[in-house]
A protein has these predicted regions:
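A short glycine-centered flexible hinge/capping loop motif at secondary-structure junctions
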Residues: 63-64
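Compact, glycine-rich, soluble single-domain proteins
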Residues: 2, 7-35, 39-44, 58-60
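Loop/turn positions that initiate beta-strands
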Residues: 52-55
Length: 64
């Protein structure tokens, strides 16, 4: 699978929320596209990510 263009070695399917946490992302502060489609945050726990999927992750940072 790829995350932000970088190949990530993973041998099995995993839910999006678990994958993001294992990769160090704060799931409360990110938006994710899976294969070009936005994944609603409410579906992170039920969205399966396979070895051929490509993810784009955007982190939100507060500021002022």
């Amino acid at each position: 699978m790829k995350i932000n263009g970088k190949e990530i070695p993973y041998e099995k399917e995993v839910t999006l929320d678990i994958l993001m946490e294992k990769q160090g992302f704060d799931i409360k502060k990110i938006a994710v596209m899976k294969n070009g489609e936005i994944v609603p945050k409410a579906e992170f726990g039920s969205t399966m990510i396979g070895t051929e999927d490509s993810l784009e992750v955007v982190s939100f940072v507060g500021g002022g």
